[in-house]
């Protein structure tokens, strides 16, 4: 069997025990060798909750969008955007004092960095005032090239967002944004031109085809189809670039992160199917185990399931390099570890 190297950003560095298989629907891999020291942070720099992870178009570096060593960046002097080489060495960082709660991260075909700020002001912390609910485009050197959304404004206009979760840039430069993260936020996909001009939007809150309950992540296959991780509805939805619904796949649990490689293989992370409340009962209706599912975009048939050994799941972002190594990020984490799956 092909060997996969799976890298996670997670909190506890306590056990290298093999995960138990909890979902026998698919081929499960549970024999892990764990490396807790793959990503090498600058001296004294902690890693925080991390939803965003992406890879450069040349496949030579990994970018991470963490929450400034904590659960958000409010009041922090740390840079949340970080670049690493494929040996795990940190190369650069930038973006301090710009974000409330870092969320989505995407590297476009020119190597520019796109990020979403998933929260904004509240009534309790004045340090949040005037920032949040935006999407930024950076050069690889950290220069701001474009800003979408109004700073600190949660709205539903054509140039406003409310908790944007994800961003994706097509080969022609058009920009797609998954706008919303549950609650009272939006539930839609926004499309803009390469210059930031609004083109169209689709979606509303609900569970029908074309509706969303947390459009958490976006990916595009070689045919140009848009894949949406509709986490709150326990499904992946597929659209054309005009927002026309094509199909939906429920076999990926609660999809938090999506990645499609050069071979049109789809990688989906499920971070919350087994989350449980104070009574011990599931917080959602998904019957699946948490982990990574790998499938072809042709038919969605899952060929490999990597069970999540972390007790509370929270695996969100995922990318794969050209050698087939898999890298992922967790929001319940403040440490690094690497899995070699045999």
Feature map (PLM): residue ranges:
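Hydrophobic h-region of N-terminal signal peptides that target proteins for export
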Residues: 10-18
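Eukaryotic scaffold repeat domains enriched in small/polar residues
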Residues: 20-342
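Positively charged n-region of N-terminal signal peptides that target proteins for export
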Residues: 1-4
């Amino acid at each position: 069997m092909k060997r996969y190297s799976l890298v996670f950003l997670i909190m506890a560095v306590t056990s290298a025990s093999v995960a138990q298989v909890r979902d026998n629907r698919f081929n499960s891999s549970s024999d892990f060798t764990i490396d807790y020291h793959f990503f090498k942070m600058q001296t004294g720099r902690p890693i925080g909750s991390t939803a965003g992870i992406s890879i450069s178009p040349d496949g030579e570096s990994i970018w991470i969008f963490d929450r400034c060593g904590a659960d958000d960046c409010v009041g922090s002097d740390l840079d949340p955007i970080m670049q690493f080489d494929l040996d795990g060495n940190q190369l650069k960082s930038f973006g301090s004092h710009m974000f409330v709660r870092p969320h989505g991260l995407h590297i476009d075909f020119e190597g520019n960095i796109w990020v979403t700020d998933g929260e904004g002001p509240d009534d309790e912390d004045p340090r949040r005032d005037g920032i949040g609910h935006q999407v930024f485009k950076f050069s690889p050197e950290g220069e701001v090239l474009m800003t979408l959304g109004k700073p600190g404004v949660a709205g539903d206009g054509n140039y406003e967002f409310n908790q944007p979760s994800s961003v994706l840039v097509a080969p022609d430069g058009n920009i797609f944004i998954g706008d919303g993260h549950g609650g009272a936020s939006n539930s839609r996909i926004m499309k803009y031109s390469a210059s930031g001009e609004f083109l169209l939007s689709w979606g509303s809150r609900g569970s029908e085809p074309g509706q969303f309950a947390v459009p958490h992540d976006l990916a595009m296959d070689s045919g140009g189809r848009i894949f949406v991780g509709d986490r709150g509805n326990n499904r992946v939805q597929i659209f054309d670039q005009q927002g026309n619904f094509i199909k939906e796949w429920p076999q990926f649990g609660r999809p938090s992160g999506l990645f499609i490689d050069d071979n049109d293989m789809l990688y989906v992370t499920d971070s919350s199917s087994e989350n449980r409340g104070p009574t011990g009962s599931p917080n959602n209706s998904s019957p699946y185990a948490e982990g990574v599912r790998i499938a072809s975009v042709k038919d969605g048939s899952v060929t490999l399931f990597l069970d999540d050994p972390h007790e509370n799941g929270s695996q969100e972002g995922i990318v794969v390099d050209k050698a087939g190594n898999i890298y992922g990020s967790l929001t319940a984490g403040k440490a690094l570890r690497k899995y070699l799956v045999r």
